[in-house]
């Protein structure tokens, strides 16, 4: 009797376990298979910090831009019949990779880590578990000077941000270099800015589909770094993008930076130059595009680096342009007119923005020594970063950036060139963008990132480099096996909290009052927030004197002295002619005097 009851009990337990397994399986399947407007996608569960995040990697959001679609705006997808397996990153878009320091982690970490292909328009989604309802969405746009980049880099992994802040993180690939930004403005076969239109189509995908993942399409924050931040600010300037997002975060980049946007004329000229180099010079634009579409992408990559004759270490060979569609005018003009999305922005820069560019060819600089440069090397560096600027213009930079009270320090020229490059290209444009935004009555918040990562592979003299706040924004120090310091883990958590607060509420302070308050940036006080492992501080007027030099004084110097070298050449030529006339007159006079004296003796 007892044995029979035991059998019944065992059967009951087995049935219960079977039902539980089936329930869990269906629950799990429900979590990792989601129906989008184009079809079903299967993701995967990732263990993260004692919990779980569901990741969907490599979801297509556009037709592959192959063949006749090369150089054209991205085309919407049709439906797929089966379940799309979104469990691994997709191809990276074609690009030239950084071969400057083979095997060196500091440069290799930014190179694409998946196969290169033109079939690259895919996006990734990370959602917290259990699946949320109406969660805030944060969309990441990578940088890389519009020439390189991919969403699959380890440093852009969205799982920690999704897990800790219970936000949905999205990132997308977009076309870069000539394949993304070659332009014959006005021609629909190659209108330019197709890399930006890729981003825009991904934003449309989020609006249509993110609710199925548990996201709120009315709470979407764009965030990006360097060219990614410039992209974010271009979406702020592009009316078609305005309904597709709510707020914006700009890390070390803005659309008014000198490298961010080229004129229609210059964009067209670069396309024609590439066509000439690659053997595609033709009588009309249609034939040029037809020829370029038949070229191997690797051949285009090889030649695109030669289209700027005076290339600097910050050259953007093919980037955004004024196409009359995505971008109707130069960013400075649109900012001046107040033609941008009225919303909240969070903007910031790193302490040593310039050093990352100096080691790629500035005279006397190297990652393998302290790069103590001379005055002559400083001046040669200015020639590289400011081609076409008159000698007087370059001397004005040297005069402004030299510390004349402490001009015996060995590091003075190295630090000065770091500041020149960082201020001109990153810091001052970002501050100017923020001022213009704030002046129109929008809430803006500005940060100054001061912490040098303990894991940074670059030498100590390079300081708090361009791009190295990203790992803290994405929570990489939370992964214990990587061996960041405890202070860095706490610091990273605080940054993720402030970024997520801003995304959720439009204010990095959120609803908490127990920490230092991050003030709103106003153009009269210009308060900004310092970010480091110590207690944050509120300071005012970051790089105010230097930025006045770049925004007010230097443009006047260029205007007055832009053709001074030509004037000098003309003056010298004129003086040489006059001198010849005078010498000829003197010779004639001497000859006359001599003859006169000869005649007097007769």
Curated annotation (Swiss-Prot):
Enzyme active site: 226 (acyl-ester intermediate), 353 (charge relay system), 466 (charge relay system)
This protein's record includes keyword Glycoprotein: yes
EC code(s) of this entry: 3.1.1.8
Membrane-spanning intervals of the chain: none
InterPro entries recorded: AB_hydrolase_fold, AChE-related_enzymes, AChE_tetra, CarbesteraseB, Carboxylesterase_B_AS, Carboxylesterase_B_CS, Cholinesterase
Broad EC category: hydrolase
UniProt-listed Pfam families: AChE_tetra (PF08674), COesterase (PF00135)
Annotated keywords: Disulfide bond, Glycoprotein, Hydrolase, Phosphoprotein, Secreted, Serine esterase, Signal
Biological role: Esterase with broad substrate specificity. Contributes to the inactivation of the neurotransmitter acetylcholine. Can degrade neurotoxic organophosphate esters.
Quaternary assembly: Homotetramer; disulfide-linked. Dimer of dimers.
PANTHER family: ACETYLCHOLINESTERASE, CHOLINESTERASE
Record protein name field: Cholinesterase
Organism phylogeny: Eukaryota, Metazoa, Chordata, Craniata, Vertebrata
Gene name tied to this protein: BCHE
